[in-house]
Amino acid sequence: VSMKQRISIICTIVMMVLLVFGCGPKQLGNTGATHQVTDGTGTVVTVPSEPKRVVPIAASTEDIVLSLVDPSRVAAVGTVPNNVPDASAKVEKHVKASAESMLSVQPDLVLVPNWMSPDAIGEMRNMQIPVYVYKTPTTVQEAKATIHEIAGLLHASDASMIASMDADLKTVEELANKYSSERPLVAFYSQFGLTGGKGSTFDDMCNYLKVNNVAA
């Protein structure tokens, strides 16, 4: 395997961590049909014990949810393409990340990353829509924790998804070890003008790939 192939794997693994993402949500109380949890912002949210009308907001959230549960439990997805098109095709409704759009599908749980506008989240909560905000992961370990967190909310198993991630990471590390004496300089720049600086997901993946991040 060439050095060029090794470096190209960065993009694949970075996208895996960005698009999928420890401890589960803190349980506060259980009434049978619902229970209270504390989300990533410290807000106490009442959620169903086994949500059946989930709306994941953002393509990355859709990737996680549709990899964990059957599409029949997903009330709607967004309008931006994700990485699970076959599962998404089985979800009939498409919505925007607004309170009005959410009301049209009557979700019993909306999952959103913490980069979403607090105002939009507040509007949904004001309409009595249960919204759980999770912290966007920036490292592989945080990604695993986020998957575990969401799986707990959905009353689903994350074992298969985590095992798949571990297998991919093992392949990458085995490949990187073949060139352990070399530390090429690499950089990440997205179409949105984002760079993978110190503390970013890209920076974390550079450690697995045994390369040096120029922007760190």
Name each model-derived stretch:
Residues 2-11:
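Bacterial N-terminal signal peptides that target proteins for export
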Residues 6, 21-60, 156-186:
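Bacterial Sec-exported substrate-binding components of ABC uptake systems
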Residues 11-20:
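Bacterial N-terminal signal peptides
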Residues 53-105, 109-114:
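A short, structured surface patch at a secondary-structure boundary
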Residues 70, 127-129, 209:
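Short, structured coil segments at secondary-structure junctions
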Residues 78-83, 198-216:
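Alpha-helical, coiled-coil/dimerization segments enriched in small aliphatic residues
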Residues 111-114, 133-137, 154, 187-199:
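Short beta-strand->loop
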Residues 119-159:
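Charged, glycine-enriched surface loops/patches
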